[in-house]
Regions:
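Class I SAM-dependent methyltransferase SAM/SAH-binding core
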Residues: 105, 114-161
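Short, glycine-/aromatic-enriched active-site segment of Class I SAM-dependent methyltransferases
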Residues: 206-229
Length: 324
């Protein structure tokens, strides 16, 4: 036994491999442990290759239903199902230089909060397009109740297979919507076609650090929980798709930190919502469970934002006038 231990200790990583490993940033102690585990027989490549990431635990999709729609608004505000309430929408939309003379489309309209605030604040005529039938129906009902069914209607639209919009617009806004679309080039080309000359298109969206991020267990969990299968790309790929569609990029900025601040601010008041619901007794248990599911949903998103695997970026794209 003692002889076996002595032989085990004699197994060392050759010096020429040590030097190469130090230069390339590998852990020599880890390499030595692997070499001993293999009885001293292994190639340099075998000793330095990355261990496969553990498989991600399966996560159920968090689909939209009446209860989730209700709970989301308790967290994010009436008409909103994610970060960025009226003040944020107005502030970010100043890049669009909106006026009552303009018409605009909102891609990924959600419950219609952003569309309605733009119509009310700037007098713009809005068409909102949402890929979730349940969100679109609820959003249209809210527009009707606000007396904005004509100025800010919300329509259900299959963004994956869209071929045309029913009219042309002066402005466009896509708020965290493109990451759910696989055929981005097609959608962006259709948007470009239905924007008038010298129009602006404002986009905020989730983008990944690089394509390897898709293999990260935490990213895979995030992908599996989304109600619509996500197809995120890198920021460079997003810019390339916009330019391919015919747009010129005026703004390209990482707003992840600001986005995380908005998430934290909204959830800071969630404990008050939980306290109020708790006082209602057993009949509030479904709502409380829904809030916990929503918290887990957003925790998975924020986790990969903080690690840098996922980012939120803002783009302002311009459709130049055609010289005739």
């Amino acid at each position: 036994m003692a002889n076996m231990d002595a032989n085990h200790k004699k197994i060392k990583v050759p010096w020429r491999w040590r030097l190469k490993a130090w230069w390339e940033g590998y852990d020599v102690a880890d390499m030595e442990a692997r070499l001993r585990a293999r009885g001293g027989k292994a190639s340099y490549k075998e000793l330095t290759q990355k261990e496969p990431e553990p498989p991600a635990e399966p996560v159920e999709k968090v689909n939209w239903d009446a209860l989730r729609i209700e709970v989301s608004q308790l967290i994010w505000g009436d008409g909103y199902c994610g970060p960025g309430g009226p003040e944020n929408v107005v502030a970010m939309s100043k890049l669009l230089a909106l006026s009552p003379k303009h018409s605009a489309m909102v891609i990924g309209a959600g419950l219609g909060g952003p569309a309605r605030v733009l119509a009310q604040e700037f007098g713009v005529w809005i068409n909102g397009y949402e890929s979730s039938a349940k969100l679109a129906a609820a959003g249209m009902e809210m527009s009707k109740k606000a007396g904005l069914e004509k100025k800010a209607p919300i329509y259900h639209q299959d963004l994956e297979n869209i071929e045309a919009f029913e009219r042309n617009f002066d402005r466009a806004l896509a708020k965290e919507a493109l990451f759910t679309v696989r055929r981005k080039d097609n959608l962006l080309k259709v948007v470009h076609t239905h924007l008038k000359d010298d129009s602006l298109f404002l986009i905020t969206d989730y983008v990944i650090r690089d394509m390897d991020s898709l293999q990260h267990p935490d990213v895979q969990q995030w992908l599996s929980q989304e109600p619509h299968d996500p197809h995120p790309v890198t920021s460079d790929m997003m810019v390339q798709s916009l330019e391919k569609a015919g747009f010129r990029i005026r703004v390209n900025e990482d707003i992840t930190e600001h986005y995380l601040d908005m998430i934290a601010e909204a959830w800071a008041t969630a404990d008050q919502v939980v306290k109020l619901l708790s006082r209602q007794g057993p009949e509030a248990s479904d709502s409380l469970n829904a809030i916990m599911r929503e918290a887990q949903f957003w925790n998975r998103r924020t986790k990969i934002m903080r690690s840098g695997e996922l980012k939120v970026c803002r783009y302002l794209a311009h459709k130049p006038a055609v010289i005739r």
